[in-house]
Regions:
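Blade-level signature of beta-propeller repeat domains, shared across WD40, Kelch, NHL, RCC1
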Residues: 360-385
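Surface loop/turn motifs at the tips and blade-to-blade linkers of beta-strand repeat domains
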Residues: 62-67, 106-111, 145-154, 202-206, ...
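Conserved beta-propeller blade signature
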Residues: 80-82, 124-127, 169-173, 221-225, ...
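Beta-strand-rich domains and repeat architectures in extracellular enzymes and scaffolds
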Residues: 61-86, 287-293, 309
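Asp-box/WD-like beta-propeller blade repeats and closely related beta-sheet repeat scaffolds
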Residues: 131-165, 173-176
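Beta-propeller domain segments
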Residues: 42-54, 159, 176-179, 193-198, ...
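Acidic, glycine-anchored loop motifs typical of Ca2+
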Residues: 98-104, 140
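Hydrophobic core register within WD40 beta-propeller blades
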Residues: 72, 118, 162, 210-213, ...
């Protein structure tokens, strides 16, 4: 069981959140040290992992139980993995000796507002909430990076994604506050800023709902997922993998999708600027979310610099699709093909028992995958048998 959380409120001050962080971390660390399990959130789940289909040599296991597990941020050399949610809670999975077996789960903070976007760097944790961006310092102090009143504050697509880029800047995806509609300001963009919040600017426009991005390890170019609009039929529009090779590009929304096909709501209206088409089209409504370029040495050599993309799964398609992890093979810095890597979270009866969200890599080269439906974080390993 998790420790009792302080009374939550969506508008807690940063000082109150900081005090909660320090109190909860102190309580949980004491509990772990004396050998109790009050902070562990493991052992209760019994997911049917045998239903999952992986390539030969690969294995998957439960790394930790985390309610509503969404975005992942690996910190402290893999000793901590922060886990965000779409509710009000923030967690951290501990693995002190980095053996790939979690020691416990800390309920780091509550009372946050959709703390989905996480980025860990230099001992600090950035949390992109729906309405602001804050930063946890190692001593528990909480600084405001972007205050309320600047970012759009809508629940629809209000779950941010965040990461620190090769340039040291913090990047945050801001979804459109609707299905298909007029947008303005920071809506439907990916923004970037200095770690202190200064020099805030729009990096990419025309982005409906990006919930994952990463930079190619060789070229340094950003690739991000984007979800196509709903209620246009089972087969359109495709989900996308986009290449942002430079700042200032427009990726079509809400005017066009895919290779320039107009959204019906904007038929006859040309985009204000030239748009950039996706480099990979996934099946419509598969809900492509997390993306990670493999950099490790555990997997076979031909996985290096390929991308893993999670598909959260459809919610209003006649025949459900997604609920799996895709592998996108890259050649010379560009996508060459795509294939299913792990499948089986969708049952034969058409009902899912898991919905994968984000993917991250531990220092040993194993992969972590979050599942907000099952409330789990999985670990995928490879052994040459």
């Amino acid at each position: 069981m998790l420790p009792p959380a302080p009374a939550a409120h969506p508008n807690l001050s940063t000082r109150e959140v900081g005090l909660m962080l320090q109190h909860t971390m102190r309580l949980c660390l004491i509990t772990l040290v004396i050998g109790l399990t009050g902070c562990a959130a493991q052992g209760g789940a019994n997911p049917p992992l045998e239903r999952l289909d992986l390539p030969p040599g690969f294995d998957i296991e439960v790394f930790a139980e985390v309610p509503g597990a969404r975005s992942l941020a690996v910190a402290d050399g893999g000793r901590k993995v922060y886990v965000g949610t779409r509710e009000r809670d923030l967690y951290a999975v501990l693995d002190g000796n980095r053996d790939g077996v979690a020691d416990g789960v800390l309920h780091v903070a509550t009372g946050l507002k959709v703390p989905n976007g996480l980025a860990a760097t230099d001992g600090r944790l950035f949390v992109a909430e729906q309405h602001r961006i804050i930063r946890f310092e190692p001593d528990g102090k909480v600084d405001i990076v972007v205050p309320e009143g600047i970012l759009p504050d809508f629940r629809h697509h209000g779950w941010r994604y965040a990461a620190v880029g090769p340039d040291g800047k913090l990047y945050v995806a801001i979804g459109a506050p609707c299905n298909i509609c007029e947008i303005s300001g920071f809506e439907g963009t990916i923004i970037r800023m200095n770690p202190d919040g200064h020099n805030l600017e729009i990096f990419a426009r025309g982005v409906r709902n990006a919930v994952g991005f990463d930079w190619h390890p060789v070229t340094g170019e950003m690739f991000f997922t984007d979800n196509g609009g709903d209620n246009l039929g089972d087969l359109i529009p495709p989900d996308e993998l986009n290449r942002a090779k430079e700042p200032g590009l427009h990726f079509g929304y809400p005017f066009v999708y895919g290779d320039g096909v107009p959204y019906p709501q904007f038929e006859g209206r040309a985009p204000p600027v030239e748009t950039t088409a996706p480099v990979v089209a996934f099946e419509a409504h598969a809900a492509a979310l997390g993306i990670h370029f493999y950099r490790g040495a555990m997997f076979p050599d031909d996985f290096r610099n390929d991308a893993f993309v999670t598909q959260h799964g459809s919610w209003n398609r006649t025949d459900p699709i997604g609920y799996r992890i895709m592998r996108v093979r890259f050649d010379d810095g560009l996508p060459a093909s795509k294939e299913v890597f792990v499948d089986g979270w969708l049952g034969r009866d058409g009902r899912p028992w898991g919905r994968v969200v984000d993917v991250a890599e531990l220092p040993d080269g194993s992969l972590l995958v979050s599942d907000d439906f099952a409330g789990l974080v999985y670990r995928i390993t490879y052994a040459d048998h």
